[in-house]
From Swiss-Prot:
Lineage, top ranks: Eukaryota, Metazoa, Chordata, Craniata, Vertebrata
Listed name of the protein: Katanin p60 ATPase-containing subunit A1
Enzyme class: isomerase
GN (gene name): katna1
Protein's UniProt keywords contain DNA-binding: no
Family annotation (CDD domains): Kp60-NTD, RecA-like_KTNA1
Organism name: Xenopus tropicalis (Western clawed frog)
Amino acid sequence: MSLLMISENVKLAREYALLGNYDSAMVYYQGVLDQMNKYLYSVKDTFLQQKWQQVWQEINMEAKHVKDIMSTLEGFKLDNSPVKTTQHEFPAHDGEVWSLPVPVERRPSPGPRKRQSVQCNDNKSHNNRFGAGKGPNLPSSKNTNNVKMKPVRAREKKDTFLKVKDEKNKSSVDVSETEVKKFDGTGYDKDLIEALERDIISQNPNIRWDDIADLEEAKKLLKEAVVLPMWMPEFFKGIRRPWKGVLMVGPPGTGKTLLAKAVATECKTTFFNISSSTLTSKYRGESEKLVRLLFEMARFYAPTTIFIDEIDSICSRRGTSEEHEASRRVKAELLVQMDGVGGASENEDPSKMVMVLAATNFPWDIDEALRRRLEKRIYIPLPSAKGREELLRINLKELELADDVNIECIAENMDGYSGADITNVCRDASLMAMRRRIEGLTPEEIRNLSRDDMHMPTTMEDFEMALKKVSKSVSASDIEKYEKWIEEFGSC
């Protein structure tokens, strides 16, 4: 399918519509809409998809206008035919024509008119045999014949119009069905499918790569795993196939979930946000079905990224005394779907890939088999001095700062703070001026404060007070555990 063909069909549809050949115009309009729907599925760029959707809506609106014109014209034809019948059937000046009231009574039903039209044909032949001897009756027979035939033609046109309308309605239903790609869950419970479809992030999380400070290595790896295979599918084949699993390891508050949101925003793939509650059920055997259904839906909506937050709660180490039989079956199904016969790695087409993106704060509790399937295991550390400074600038870009605020000095005093801790410090410091302003005021006085009174710049003293109130949440011993694990099992 080429864009030139779509353009030519649009031109033909508009030309036929301008010339008054509305039936042919509708055929071309319907074909153009179908071609554009098929072409939309091949467009990966979101901006281009929005442009094509706008064009589709404009063409669809033109087709609706043509359809309205057709229905209006048919309405005129159907409304005019009975009026002509009454005018010609009972002429006021012709005294020899019987003014029978029967045809007037039969007007609502179309059946008797067909029978009368046959009789009129017989009368016509009879009048032709007699020639001019029956002169006064000849015009009335002709008029009657014409009058009787016109409703038949109108009914035939009405029938064909209704058939065409039904076919167009069916085709419009088909177009609306092809607009939204819907998973066929034959063999699965409808509630299970709806539960997983709710975890598809269709709305934009609005987190960009630039909104995440530092973590350049992690960004580079995620782009290589998700973005580049979409841009260069001919390169990522065979031994260079895309990574099927990425595990992000690090202390809490370092930006693992933010990286996943950036993947959902930037990478233009279907994004499943899965937690342990999504894949658990109180009914026996349904948790394994959910895992299998998840990967089948992921392959259907491919390219897909499945983000499993806190994966240690779903796939912890097997064989322990605390393990339950149900959780063991769920882990086995997850491992099979990721790297089993017919699993997610069977498809060699990079545009149909299914990648599992996982995050955990307890990597030492993850099962060994899952660790092997998550081929890339990267460490998301605490922000460096440069990262802390960059994170401060991102958090404070909407605040009015006093002249004495030194961001470099604040970043140096935050050594050992995680990204979430730095955000909490900035939030607390931004509230200091408001706290000083409303101190000692009554609730009525606080309500009467103007907006200008509340917008006061944040000073260096506010940051110093916030640093005293907000302590770091990650200990040095925890950092040593993460570094030791990543040194032993890391795969950057």
